[in-house]
């Protein structure tokens, strides 16, 4: 039986665009040919993500997105997801100013980024021209863009 479950919620932040965001995530999963998924996405503040970053990565600082994959990683790209994404809207507000982009563009980009990690992609650098994962990320963003 194919499982298709997507849960969204907020921790310590207000978010008003749940329907649009839900549909955006479904479009990303469809674009990436994800056959089966159990995915939870938490939109949060810096305090919430910093606690998780400290507990699981031993980094006592906030970050943009954390991904937690509950499937066995085999070094290959998987077309199933069982995991969680934690995304700090507070952090994205800062980075959107730094990169001179809309905050919702950063939300979409970081959501795609986290999903790519959950299906097995990794990157060593932040080179958007040459890192396969980041090239794919930007392609998916272009193709599924502007839902807010």
Swiss-Prot record:
Record-linked SUPFAM superfamilies: Metalloproteases ('zincins'), catalytic domain
Record GO biological process: rRNA processing
Membrane-spanning intervals of the chain: none
Subcellular location as annotated: Cytoplasm
GO molecular function: metalloendopeptidase activity; RNA endonuclease activity; zinc ion binding
UniProt KW keywords: Cytoplasm, Endonuclease, Hydrolase, Metal-binding, Nuclease, Ribosome biogenesis, rRNA processing, Zinc
E.C. no: 3.1.-.-
Binding-site positions, Zn(2+): 113, 117, 123
Main location: cytoplasm
Recorded GO CC terms: cytoplasm
InterPro entries the record matches: MetalPrtase_cat_dom_sf_prd, YbeY, YbeY_CS
Enzyme class: hydrolase
Sequence similarity: Belongs to the endoribonuclease YbeY family.
Cross-referenced NCBIfam families: rRNA maturation RNase YbeY
Protein purpose: Single strand-specific metallo-endoribonuclease involved in late-stage 70S ribosome quality control and in maturation of the 3' terminus of the 16S rRNA.
Name under which the protein is recorded: Endoribonuclease YbeY
Source organism of this protein record: Borrelia hermsii (strain HS1 / DAH)
Gene of this entry: ybeY
